[in-house]
């Protein structure tokens, strides 16, 4: 199917520069009058985040170009794209296989091994590891150590935003708001300037959750995607955010980059330390 506005997802378990540059080099071979966009998704080391990225790619009918050295992650991309009819191009596996065949050696399969491990890079890795460790309220102690805390109900982009901000060396913890589960006391022990509330429209949540259930092979009639349940969760989250006194961002129809930009602006306005984005 021909598309007027081509979108390419450059997906990597490292920085993603290779996938992005290859995509740019290929695009330069065409006289493109129409607009196109290359979106880079680095550090795809979390299966859940990777799956969510693939779901977004499907929604945008994007071409996926990826440099993943982890065989399991490669398999996830291949299976998803085959099932959903998406086009994807693996830039590394065939080359690794041929080199292995000719040399008799096995690849290390370490993401980002070519990179220079300088201080800034280690800070970024630390922030990413922090985001993974304290994702989805796994350990409330992370709330006390984080530069910023995201709160919101399921499917309000907490995890992808945490990873995106981590790539700017910002340590982010996110806390899910569920009516049946008490919010960690640590949330009320920190400066509210560090907390950002996330919400979404009921219709969008219903759509996203239904797609999520389908991707997991579950019934779309589950309570998770029920509109009445969603409204209940939204009311609960609104009440909690008012108690906290934090700013709230509606992520409906917003790209991750756009929402992250709003968060960074709020951090600046609140006088919180902002880490300069590292150009790599």
Swiss-Prot record:
ADP binds at residues 152-159. The keyword Phosphoprotein does not apply. Its EC number is 2.7.11.32, 2.7.4.27. Pfam families: Kinase-PPPase. It comes from the Bacteria. It catalyses: N(tele)-phospho-L-histidyl/L-threonyl-[pyruvate, phosphate dikinase] + ADP = N(tele)-phospho-L-histidyl/O-phospho-L-threonyl-[pyruvate, phosphate dikinase] + AMP + H(+); N(tele)-phospho-L-histidyl/O-phospho-L-threonyl-[pyruvate, phosphate dikinase] + phosphate + H(+) = N(tele)-phospho-L-histidyl/L-threonyl-[pyruvate, phosphate dikinase] + diphosphate. GO terms for molecular function: ADP binding; ATP binding; phosphotransferase activity, phosphate group as acceptor; protein serine/threonine kinase activity. InterPro entries: Kinase-pyrophosphorylase, PPDK_reg. Keywords: Kinase, Nucleotide-binding, Serine/threonine-protein kinase, Transferase. Belongs to the pyruvate, phosphate/water dikinase regulatory protein family. PDRP subfamily. Bifunctional serine/threonine kinase and phosphorylase involved in the regulation of the pyruvate, phosphate dikinase (PPDK) by catalyzing its phosphorylation/dephosphorylation. This is Putative pyruvate, phosphate dikinase regulatory protein. It comes from Clostridioides difficile (strain 630) (Peptoclostridium difficile).
């Amino acid at each position: 199917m021909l598309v007027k506005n081509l979108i390419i997802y450059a997906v990597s378990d490292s920085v993603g520069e290779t996938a992005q540059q290859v995509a740019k080099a290929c695009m330069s071979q065409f006289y493109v009058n129409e607009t196109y966009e290359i979106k880079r998704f680095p550090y795809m080391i979390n299966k859940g985040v990777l799956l969510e990225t693939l779901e977004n790619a499907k929604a945008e009918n994007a071409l996926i170009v990826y440099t993943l050295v982890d065989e399991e992650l490669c398999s996830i991309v291949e299976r998803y794209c085959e099932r959903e009819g998406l086009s994807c191009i693996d830039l590394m596996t065939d080359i690794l296989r041929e080199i292995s065949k000719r040399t008799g050696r096995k690849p290390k399969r370490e993401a980002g091994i070519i990179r220079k491990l300088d201080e800034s890079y280690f800070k970024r890795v630390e922030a990413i590891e922090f985001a993974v460790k304290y994702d989805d309220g796994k350990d409330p102690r992370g709330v006390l150590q984080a530069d910023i805390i995201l709160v919101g109900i399921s499917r309000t982009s907490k995890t992808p935003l945490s990873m995106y901000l981590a790539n700017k060396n910002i340590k982010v913890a996110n806390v899910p708001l569920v009516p049946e589960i008490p919010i960690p006391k640590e949330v009320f022990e920190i400066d509210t300037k560090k907390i950002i509330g996330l919400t979404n429209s009921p219709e969008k949540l219903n759509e996203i959750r239904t797609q999520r259930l389908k991707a997991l092979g579950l019934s779309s009639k589950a309570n998770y995607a029920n509109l009445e349940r969603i409204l209940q969760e939204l009311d609960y989250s609104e009440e909690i955010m008012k108690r906290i006194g934090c700013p709230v961002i509606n992520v409906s129809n917003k790209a991750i980059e756009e929402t992250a930009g709003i968060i960074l602006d709020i951090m600046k306005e609140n006088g919180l330390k902002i880490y300069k984005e590292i150009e790599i």
